[in-house]
């Protein structure tokens, strides 16, 4: 970003300077409030998951089927990607290919500049965290506003995400209230005077703060939980409705999706839609499950772009053993059961992908040149 250009969005935290895992873990262990916040949240999520999984008689068979589908996609990924590209193109979607983070960030920024927009609203997305899209857009004078409640807390708090599913899991409601009171007014509608730390009040403040951004946004950016190869259908699941707002109000939608998110057919998608909500949020189904195939006149975005991102995934795929990490559907169940994560938190892992899967997938995607990545095998009790 130019030295003369004023920031539009809150200055985020940075992964730079976070020490190697053994040292970072000691910092987390010394924070009693952090451990209390994490223990409360992960215990709650674990209990809900156990109840919902027990309702499905063939739960383990479903998990096996999902792994087999992912493995089949990995063996024939080139074929499925080309099939998905053809189907999406036929449906009116513009497909882009990004080798790495720089490619993806450039593509998204170029689309925004071509549309003449200086701000975008975002759906919660791990992959855009991975490529640091928000800062890349900020450097181009484009404000990226997070609309997921937890991501909003992280953004307004000049913070970093610490959990795959609940990025602000390390914050309690008292801290959230302080962030809203101090920061909301700097970037839009302020928090109501005299707001308490009662969750409904905090949620209402976030809703009002975000509504003006939704209504004026001309472009949205999302990730994607799945892409169905045979139909070119994109799938996003979420629990708050902010994603549905991003998918329906703006005229332009850009979805950045990792190449491993392909599933062959709608029937295959069914397996994952049974597993993901129960394993992540402990719900029978996500309150908002959005599937869209191309452009429909008068309904939703009229200009759709999909950026298919590699960013190290091909390298992971070339490892006969390590490629199993690409089965991950970002449910976060491994974080919620991990005694190490529960005690040290997500920031100790030094990247947007924390917990057991992050300790594996992060170094696979980035390589082992950084000492922090070489230290991540120590983030295990095995």
Language-model segment annotations:
Residues 2-321:
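The feature marks the mature, well-folded catalytic cores of soluble enzymes
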């Amino acid at each position: 970003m130019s030295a003369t250009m004023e920031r539009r969005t809150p200055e985020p935290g940075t992964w730079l300077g976070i020490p190697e895992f053994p040292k970072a873990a000691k910092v987390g262990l010394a924070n009693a409030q952090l451990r209390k916040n994490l223990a409360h949240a992960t215990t709650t999520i674990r209990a809900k998951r156990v109840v919902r999984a027990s309702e499905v008689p063939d739960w383990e068979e479903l998990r096996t089927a999902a792994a087999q589908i992912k493995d089949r996609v990995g063996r024939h990924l080139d074929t499925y990607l080309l099939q998905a590209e053809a189907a999406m193109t036929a449906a009116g979607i513009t497909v882009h290919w990004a080798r790495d983070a720089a490619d993806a960030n450039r593509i998204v920024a170029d689309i925004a500049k071509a549309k003449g927009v200086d701000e975008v609203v975002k759906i919660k997305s791990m992959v855009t965290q991975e490529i640091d899209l928000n800062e890349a857009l900020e450097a181009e004078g484009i404000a990226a506003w997070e609309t997921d409640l937890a991501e909003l807390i992280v953004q307004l708090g000049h913070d970093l995400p610490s959990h795959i599913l609940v990025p602000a899991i390390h914050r309690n409601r008292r801290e959230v209230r302080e962030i809203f009171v101090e920061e909301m007014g700097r970037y839009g509608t302020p928090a109501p005077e005299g707001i308490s730390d009662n969750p409904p009040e905090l949620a209402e403040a976030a809703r009002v703060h975000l509504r003006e951004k939704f209504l004026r946004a001309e472009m949205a950016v999302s990730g994607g939980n799945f892409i169905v190869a045979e139909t070119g259908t994109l799938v996003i699941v979420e629990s708050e409705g902010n994603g549905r707002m991003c998918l329906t109000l703006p005229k332009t939608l850009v979805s950045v999706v990792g190449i491993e998110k392909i599933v062959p057919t709608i029937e295959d998608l069914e397996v994952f839609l049974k597993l993901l909500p129960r394993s992540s949020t402990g719900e029978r189904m996500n309150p908002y499950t959005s599937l869209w195939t191309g452009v429909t006149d008068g309904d939703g975005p009229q200009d759709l772009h999909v950026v298919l991102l590699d960013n190290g995934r091909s390298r992971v795929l070339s490892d006969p053993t390590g490629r199993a990490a690409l089965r991950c559907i970002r449910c976060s169940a491994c974080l919620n059961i991990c005694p190490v994560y529960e005690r040290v938190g997500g920031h100790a892992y030094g990247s947007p992908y924390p917990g057991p899967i992050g300790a594996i997938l992060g170094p696979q995607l980035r390589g082992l040149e950084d000492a922090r990545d070489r230290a991540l095998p120590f983030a295990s009790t095995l």
